[in-house]
Amino acid sequence: MSSQGWKGFLASVEVGIGLLGYGTVGSSVNRLLVESGDEIERATGHRLRVVRALVRDTKKERSFPPGDGVLTTDFAALRDDPDIHVVAEVMGGLDPAGRYVRELLDAGKPVVSANKQLVARDGADLFATASAAGVQLRFEASVCAAIPVVKVLRESLVVANVHRVLGIVNGTTNFILSRMERGGSYAEALAEAQELGYAEADPTDDVSGADAAAKMAILATVAFGSRVRFEDVERRGIEDVEPSHVAAAADLGMVVRLVGIATLAGGAVDVRVQPAFVDRSHALAAVDGAFNAVMLQGDAIREITLEGPGAGGIETASAVVADLVSVVGTSGTGFLQNDACWRELERLPPSDWRSGFYVHLEVADRPGVLAHAASRLAAHDVSVAQLVQRLNNGEATLELVLHETSLGELSAALREIATFPEVLRAPFALPVITERVL
């Protein structure tokens, strides 16, 4: 839509909204626009109304019926409708969602997206398309649903020089790990999450860390002003976290959480998602169940934490509507650059990443095993901060908390330790997050 088109619609009270998708989120967006229409009009001077919604099946029963003539299976009809001024993409997936968003931007229609995979993987191309067309592409709902972290980073903290982002950004895995603290296996906790609707029938994207990795790629890109792609994120899921690890964390005054960690130091960026031991004194340790939290650290802010529901139809819809209101309030073109990227930064080699670590070793209970393992750690400048040893029928479990070291040095030491004939299982290691440097 040209600037003349925007001036035309701004002369009227009603703004036409198109929806790509009318499932749980899409119907919730429409519900909010209808039920909160007066509040939106007071804030923007405009009433937002859904004109068309693209669906696969117009006959399907809907939890919030959109009205006669709104549902369509014809994308071109939505794209070319002059009464549609802004479009919300809430269908998910890469295709056809990506193709539709590109065509809408090319047609001059601002787009709001809740699609983390699309923004994380194809964001550079989409932002370039939006900029060329002179319209906005907003994506608050793609990360942490009701937590307005993208807006905070892009607007409120624009001069904060944020250099670290820590986050629990996947509610499914946080629910599973929280339930495992109360007893039970990973499989039992996953089954409960599925029964309650927190986990999909196929939970792979969640439990593998892929969902969280896409969100962290977006957050790191916005926070650091440099493109971080999904493929740049080091990723490890929670599938191999066992009740014994959760119990060991509790004994050490910690909890296990799937944590996203993005760091900018020395001109290099590292972004990763993996289970971690989190000290109970740390703010993220208190994030329970399906909730999300994002901690931002920067020169001008020290540290702030945003917490709230990270998923759900109405929560995601709330973020979509907030972006729609922002688009309308800034006349569609906006005062911010679409793309947050303004510089190129190097990627930190994964082996150079530094942290404290927890290591779990299962060995035969024989003289000298602990000393031998300690010597291998020391040979790689890895020192032990805390040790717990448990004996059971000729076997020993060693729980080690290590001072900060590089991942490369620790990995080299553990590879050597794994070759010991006394080692009964492969060493298991997770980073440790505390309020202090170990």
Identify the meaning behind each predicted range.
Residues 238, 280, 302-304, 308-314:
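Glycine-rich phosphate/pyrophosphate-binding beta-alpha loops
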Residues 274-299, 313-314, 378-393:
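Low-complexity, glycine/alanine/valine/leucine- and proline-rich hydrophobic stretches
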Residues 2-107:
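N-terminal glycine-/serine-/threonine-rich beta1-alpha1-beta2 phosphate-ribose binding loop
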Residues 319, 324-438:
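A conserved regulatory-domain signal marking ACT and ACT-like small-molecule sensing domains
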Residues 131-211, 218:
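Rossmann-like NAD(P)H-binding beta-loop-alpha module
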Residues 179-180, 188-286, 291-293:
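Substrate-binding/catalytic subdomain of NAD(P)-dependent oxidoreductase enzymes
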Residues 96-107, 116-154:
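Rossmann-fold NAD(P)-binding glycine/threonine-rich loop
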Residues 110-112, 384:
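A short hydrophobic/small-residue beta-strand
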